[in-house]
Amino acid sequence: MSRPALRWVVAEGETLALGVWLDRHAPGSQPSLGDGRVFVNGKRITDPGYPLEPGHCVELYAARVSDGEVRVLARFEGVVLVDKPAGLATEPDHAGIAASVVARAAELLDTPRAELHAMSRLDVGVSGVVLLTLDRGARRRIEALRDAGRVRRRYVAIGSGGPNPTSGVWDAPIGRGRGTLRSAFGRDAESATTRYRTAAQAGSASLLALEPVTGRTHQLRVHAAHAGCPLYGDPAYGGPKRLVQADGAVLTLRRIALHAAWVELPFLGGVRVESALPAALLELWSALGGAAEDGASALE
């Protein structure tokens, strides 16, 4: 393991829950719990309620930098669409210790980072199309289109189980859950709607085509889990972290099986900006017994 980016020793009188302690010493770093980047006395801790005692050593590791590269897919009228690899944050870490899509895109475009604004945010373990704006006018235009429901987004996911019925609409409000997680019908829940379709099945697994109507935090992950098909590689919401194959080999999932496959904007004349399904998801679907051509059905 690499060296931690930040390390503290809990002082006398700081008998606090880990989440509260992080808020005090590293504001904005609580998402690192869900990412598995916080250790106490050498043990990975994901529970924000974990009790700290004086003398405990708390270590915060930087987010794992993805091996993939950010690619510019399209640029027009103050809008940039880029391809995000899994393992890379969309925006800089709140603790200031992680690389990000925004930072890399700024380098590629030779643009000051402060001028780029992420209009769509993918979780660290998710890949695909991210929409950025270069100026305030473009930001307002995209916000207006999004509020009017005219920005279409298609995600492809692999669920450990299948929804019943196989297609339809998930309409469950999403609120706060434990720590930084979200929960269907959780605290302070807000309306959340996702259109879904089962593109293919392989045993108990399902290849899902998802279109979010709203944009709540972790919406697709929460809705899939609530529907009984948590996503592979998403243990935070009950998804499997490993897959034991027929020959006994164990496939460890290092990302969430969720990919932002395309975005469609009205001023593109109906043209979709696409990101190809990543090899890791194709490999997983094949290992589950799925067919190579199933991916095309999920993109339709």
Positions of PLM-derived features:
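RNA pseudouridine synthases
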Residues: 1-300
